[in-house]
Amino acid sequence: MKFGIVARRDKEEALKLAYRVYDFLKVHGYEVVVDKETYEHFPHFKEGDVIPLDEFDVDFIVAIGGDGTILRIEHMTKKDIPILSINMGTLGFLTEVEPSDTFFALNRLIEGEYYIDERIKVRTYIDGENRVPDALNEVAILTGIPGKIIHMKYYVDGGLADEVRADGLVVSTPTGSTGYAMSAGGPFIDPRLDVILIAPLLPLPKTSVPMVIPGSSRIDIRMLTDREIILAIDGQYYEHLPPNVEITVVKSPRKTKFIRFTREIYPKYTIRIKERH
């Protein structure tokens, strides 16, 4: 059994806990590698165990941080590696374990007392080319000039779904429905569902509303504006695009895999949504 460790880089408590996890696994005889960026912020790991995140080839990743740490893992790893997520963030919609339960959770993982929670992702094509990371939460198309709306049409499976004048458009997975899409007026979607949410950002007029479509759908977005736009993936990756670009979003063949110890969705999600607001 081989483990990878990734920690939130700006929080000393997360880095120290990462080292304790590393030491625990090494003492118990497991092979462990550590993310290079984690090591650079806390250089106490054995240097021979340090590799770049995009080279991880392990059975499990222990992620110590918040949702941002998980998104970094998902954007950089090349394989769908199950993630045990330890919450060192704020709300931690994606995380599973509180820091005080870290070693109890590791023992359960080692004993095989867990299940894999698979989450869909979406893939983006820019003029037919896939050059950006898959999104676990959302793809956002945003105005490149604050205060200036963008004009676009979007099609679902070839049919015109809406023509929108807005600050942008969010295409979200169920996992991302508690994030940017919810701020745009979208609903909470149970993460077990195979659907995609499309939500305009501050549309004019307000007759353009969020819609939920089958996960198998293809969304084609065509710009009718003459100004630059910004493409944002999970709030982590950004690219400026010319006004005549065509963007296509589909469900990715890849999935995010989380280590879970309970199949309970409620009340965890509803409580955290209320905490957020």
From Swiss-Prot:
Where located?
A: Cytoplasm
Supply the SUPFAM superfamilies for this chain: NAD kinase/diacylglycerol kinase-like
The record's annotation in Gene3D superfamilies points to:
Probable inorganic polyphosphate/atp-NAD kinase, domain 1 (3.40.50.10330), Probable inorganic polyphosphate/atp-NAD kinase, domain 2 (2.60.200.30)
Gene Ontology cellular-component terms listed: cytoplasm
Keyword NAD in annotation: yes
Q: How does activity depend on pH?
A: Optimum pH is 6.8. At 70 degrees Celsius for 60 minutes, the enzyme does not lose activity in a pH range of 4.0 to 10.5.
Per its UniProt record, what InterPro entries does this chain match? ATP-NAD_kinase_N, ATP-NAD_kinase_PpnK-typ_C, NAD/diacylglycerol_kinase_sf, NADK
The EC number of this protein is: 2.7.1.23
User: Which biological processes are named by the entry's GO terms?
Assistant: NAD metabolic process; NADP biosynthetic process
Question: What Pfam families does the record point to?
Answer: NAD_kinase, NAD_kinase_C
Q: Which reaction does it catalyse?
A: NAD(+) + ATP = ADP + NADP(+) + H(+)
Q: Keywords assigned by UniProt?
A: ATP-binding, Cytoplasm, Kinase, NAD, NADP, Nucleotide-binding, Transferase
Any coiled-coil ranges, and where? none
| Positions that bind NAD(+) | 67-68, 72, 137-138, 148, 165, 167, 175, 178-183, 236
Q: Name one GO molecular function term.
A: metal ion binding
Can you tell me what the entry says about the temperature dependence of activity? Extremely high thermostability. Upon heating at 95 degrees Celsius for 10 minutes the kinase activity is not lost, but about 80% of the activity is lost upon incubation at 100 degrees Celsius for 10 minutes.
Where, by residue number, is the active site?
D67
Cofactor(s) in the UniProt record: a divalent metal cation
Subunit annotation: Homotetramer.
What exactly does this protein do? Involved in the regulation of the intracellular balance of NAD and NADP, and is a key enzyme in the biosynthesis of NADP. Catalyzes specifically the phosphorylation on 2'-hydroxyl of the adenosine moiety of NAD to yield NADP. It can use ATP and other nucleoside triphosphates (GTP,UTP) as well as inorganic polyphosphate (poly(P)) as a source of phosphorus. NAD is the preferred substrate for the kinase, but NADH can also be used as phosphoryl acceptor.
Family per similarity comment: Belongs to the NAD kinase family.
Q: Which PANTHER family match?
A: BIFUNCTIONAL NADP PHOSPHATASE_NAD KINASE (PTHR20275:SF43), NAD KINASE (PTHR20275)
Q: What is this protein called?
A: NAD kinase
Organism per entry: Pyrococcus horikoshii (strain ATCC 700860 / DSM 12428 / JCM 9974 / NBRC 100139 / OT-3)
